[in-house]
Amino acid sequence: MPKQKTHRASAKRFKRTANGGLKRHHAYTGHRFHGKTKKQRRHLRKAAMVSASDLKRIKQMLSQMR
């Protein structure tokens, strides 16, 4: 049986936290900022946590990552 491998695209996009959660970056941060308020842009800079409904699936993709 072959070994399960880490999904490399996901490994580049998520970071594990000390308590076992996953940090992610916000979407909509590449361009077209003229339609967003300063408050929206400021909040988009901060990292967000992966929601509980997605956590199980993403953790399986990152099963070999420490």
From Swiss-Prot:
Pfam families named among the record's database cross-references: Ribosomal_L35p
- Enumerate the NCBIfam families for this protein: rpmI_bact
Q: Is the keyword Transmembrane helix assigned to this protein? A: no
**By its UniProt entry, which PROSITE patterns does this protein fall under?**
RIBOSOMAL_L35 (PS00936)
- The residue ranges crossing the membrane are none
| Keyword tags | Ribonucleoprotein, Ribosomal protein
Taxonomy, superkingdom: Bacteria
Q: What name has this protein been given in UniProt?
A: Large ribosomal subunit protein bL35
Identify the GO cellular component terms for this protein. cytosolic large ribosomal subunit
**What family does the entry list?**
Belongs to the bacterial ribosomal protein bL35 family.
UniProt-annotated stretches for the region Disordered: 1-42
Entry's Gene Ontology BP terms: translation
Q: Which GO terms of the molecular function aspect are on file? A: structural constituent of ribosome
